């Protein structure tokens, strides 16, 4: 079976049950994800899309779901790389039976970086607080997400984030890094910042 579907199949927790049924119903599943803006074959789409291919229904073999990275520009369809997502569901150590996000991995180097990030048990969310120091974050940024020490401008996409005072500078630098952007591209929708 081959489908062209909304790219939310990868990042939305609402589709966790759908991904479970896909992983359990077929031997091999491939999801390629494309941005609507610069991928020529989808340039008139109103949302970014994924191509999902499912093979060998009701097979005893269950290899899970393989994903590409999210393509910003049209790739050669014959050279798309995929990686198995089974051990990279988010939150860490989730299964398809639980509420999760599916990563858009693609090339092996992305898997290597994820392995290093997921090796550690510390979570950035542990330094967030309901009071303390405040930074400002831009929660929507098609190509970048930013953190600021002062509110840069008025927008519905600029929000305060409270952080333990000792970690304000650290979190500001982290959220302005390409590593943070990498994480959001892997697990997010490519436009809005995940809060988990």
Protein language model regions, located:
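Generic recognition of long tandem-repeat/solenoid scaffolds
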Residues: 137-138, 193
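Generic structural signal for small/hydrophobic residues in well-ordered secondary structure
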Residues: 134-137, 171
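Short amphipathic beta-strand starts and helix->beta connectors
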Residues: 142-146, 184-187
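Basic, amphipathic alpha-helical recognition segments used for DNA target recognition
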Residues: 161-196
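Short, glycine-/Ser/Thr-/acidic-enriched flexible segments
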Residues: 8, 59, 140-144, 150-151, ...
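Signature of N6-adenine DNA methyltransferases within the class I
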Residues: 1-130, 148-158, 193-195
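Structured loops at beta-to-helix junctions and adjacent beta-edge loops in soluble globular domains
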Residues: 54-57, 70, 138-140, 162-164, ...
């Amino acid at each position: 079976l081959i489908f062209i579907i909304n790219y939310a199949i990868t990042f939305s927790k609402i589709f966790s049950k759908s991904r479970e049924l896909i992983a359990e119903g077929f031997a091999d599943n491939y999801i390629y994800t494309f941005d609507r803006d610069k991928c020529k074959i989808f340039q008139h789409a109103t949302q970014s899309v994924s191509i999902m291919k499912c093979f060998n229904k009701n097979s005893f073999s269950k290899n899970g779901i393989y994903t590409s990275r999210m393509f910003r520009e049209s790739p050669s369809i014959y050279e798309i790389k995929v990686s198995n997502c089974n051990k990279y569901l988010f939150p860490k150590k989730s299964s398809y039976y639980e509420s999760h996000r599916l990563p858009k991995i693609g090339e092996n180097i992305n898997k290597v970086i994820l392995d290093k990030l997921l090796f550690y048990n510390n979570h950035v969310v542990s330094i967030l607080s309901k009071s303390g120091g405040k930074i400002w974050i831009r929660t929507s940024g098609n190509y970048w997400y930013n953190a600021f020490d002062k509110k840069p401008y008025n927008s519905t996409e600029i929000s305060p984030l409270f952080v333990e005072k000792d970690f304000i500078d650290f979190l500001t630098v982290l959220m302005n890094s390409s590593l943070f952007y990498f994480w959001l591209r892997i697990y997010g929708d490519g436009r809005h910042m995940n809060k988990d």
